[in-house]
Amino acid sequence: MKQLIMEMEEYASSKNVPIIEKKSIAFIMKYIKDNNVKGILEIGSAIGYSAILMASAKEDVFVTTIERDEERYMECLKNVKKCGLDKKINVVFQDALDVNLTEDLKFDLIFIDAAKGQYTRLDAPISFSSLTISTYLA
């Protein structure tokens, strides 16, 4: 998986795809381990870099990640499958503002890594039914 992560970093750099900084993902991965995080909702998948790293932080972590850009969504799916985490990462192709997660889901962590200019619009419009949230990182 280390090789895939390096390839993803190179891809992101060459295609100007924003990915999380190494210090930030290291902090999040430590948080996941230290706080027994099991369910993660990520808004803004890009190429799947952070979802893959978060899902690999612990054996029992499951990530639902949402991406609205079709090219990035396809790249994310490819990378998730390539690293063998397709059973631990659910990639959703939709705008986060239109998502309605109606299943009974429990997220211990919500990580918003979407278009930074849209953060203020993400606060209320996302509709969750029977959702428990423990931690929210933006």
Residue spans for each PLM region:
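Conserved beta-strand signature within the Rossmann-like core of class I S-adenosyl-L-methionine
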Residues: 133-138
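A short alpha-helical cap/connector motif
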Residues: 1-109, 116-131
